[in-house]
Amino acid sequence: MLILLGLLCLYTGLYVARTYWRLRHFPGPLVARFTDLGRLWWVKTSRSHHHHMGLHSRYGQYVRLGPNMISISDPDAIPLVYPIRPGVPKSDFYRSMMPYTRKGRSLPLVFNTRDEDLHKRLKTPIAHLYSLSNILTFEAFVDQVLEILFRQFEERFVPDQAPFNLGNWLQYFAFDVMGTMSFSRRYGFLEKGRDDTGLLSAIWAFMKAAAPVTQMPWVDLVWNKNPFIALFRATPAQPILNVVLSRINDRRNELYSTTSTPEKVNERDFLSRFMHIQSNSDTIPPWAVTAWSFSNVIAGSDTTAVAMKTLWYNLLLHPATMHRLRKELVQAQQQSKLSHPFPAWNEISGLPYLNACVNEALRIHPPFCLPFERIVPAEGMTIGDHFFPGGTVIGMNPWVINRHRPTFGEDADAWRPERWLEDPARTRQMENTLLSFGAGRRVCLGKNIALLELKKLTSALVLHYELEIVNPEKFQSQNFFFFKQEGLYAAVKRRSAGSPELYPDDAVPH
């Protein structure tokens, strides 16, 4: 036993000495030279994005966050760290983000699988489903959920104009849209005004368990993905998997009880298309439908909700922004360029100030805020004036990159949508630097869904309602890779001019 302990200590000592020596020229806090405990703790505090920003302000564009981890804030490095072609693989960070089942198995997703061949087998068959042209076939689903949201506003909040938790309702909207797109079934959050499925709390519990150990992946194996421990407690991802598996089983039962083919049963939603794709391929893993659906539930909904809350918090906090946005939308409406009651994507996607507000929301508060980690290939690589030995973990934090002052301006910490309209060349540079949805070959598949929801919801709300923020100082965020934003309260009333009433007083639909 003593011999084993001695060998372990020797191995640990040699590892620390080796990593310390080969990366010794990179600046950073003292603790980062010897252990990853510092960066685990920063995530545990739910404020790692502020810690990382402070470290880059102090040490520069290349900061050592751990014995073998360098954080980079130079936008010129984006195409090198996140290339279009394979060669710079994901780190063990992403293994920690894999859902773990009671059967002792991790569920690889398109987002978190490190195996390039498996990634190709998972992504290639479904990538076209997330193209803008295909996402627009779901636009009617967004309109259906918008109608339910506005109906709830009319019944619950417009009559007495009492403050309500706008942030919760934006999140309910995002989840019910994705439920409709994925399964042709809403979760029912909007009708009930709450989540009685436990899904939202389960997602947050999963992120709180997974995010800290992404910084020390061996802890994930010992605690979150330990088969022995799983015998005595539910894994954090299990409640989410239960929702996904329930929807899949319901669809299969529906198929068995009818003469319809998989293509004909709810042929417009994601699940039917997932099942059809899998049934026509011998190379797709048998659990792929579960993995694809899980991604839609957790990433397709929660990250969109973060962008919505950020956008609406800033619209309500900055009246000049709201005035200019409403002026743009009302002008388009008066020129008969917008459908009623809900503007269509092709009518609003080119509106300059709406696009500027959406871009600014995604910039100032990206949905994901830990470095997207990659492993330097064995031969090493040079970035800027620095050589990185093979095996070094490198990454870029969207929160830090999106505040790069030479790119976004000296006021990069401030909300200012106008920055996106001032100079076409600079706008292109900012768009190429924006890291909110990732970059390269592993860019987020759900980007088009998020943009569709953001622009349709925002344009419809601005045209039909006036909202006033209540106690804005209570709005706060916690970061566990995904964000949890709380405290966005507002009062709402119908607009008195500028657009026809959505629902006449005597004709509120039920």
UniProtKB/Swiss-Prot annotation:
The keyword Oxidoreductase applies. Residues 1-17 form the signal peptide. The keyword Metal-binding applies. Heme binds at residue 444. Cytochrome P450 monooxygenase; part of the gene cluster 41 that mediates the biosynthesis of an extracellular and diffusible metabolite that is able to stimulate colony sclerotial production. The lineage of its organism: Eukaryota, Fungi, Dikarya, Ascomycota, Pezizomycotina. This is Cytochrome P450 monooxygenase AFLA_114810. It comes from the Eukaryota. It is an enzyme of class 1 (oxidoreductase). Its cofactor is heme. It comes from Aspergillus flavus (strain ATCC 200026 / FGSC A1120 / IAM 13836 / NRRL 3357 / JCM 12722 / SRRC 167). Gene3D superfamilies: Cytochrome P450. Keywords: Heme, Iron, Metal-binding, Monooxygenase, Oxidoreductase, Signal.
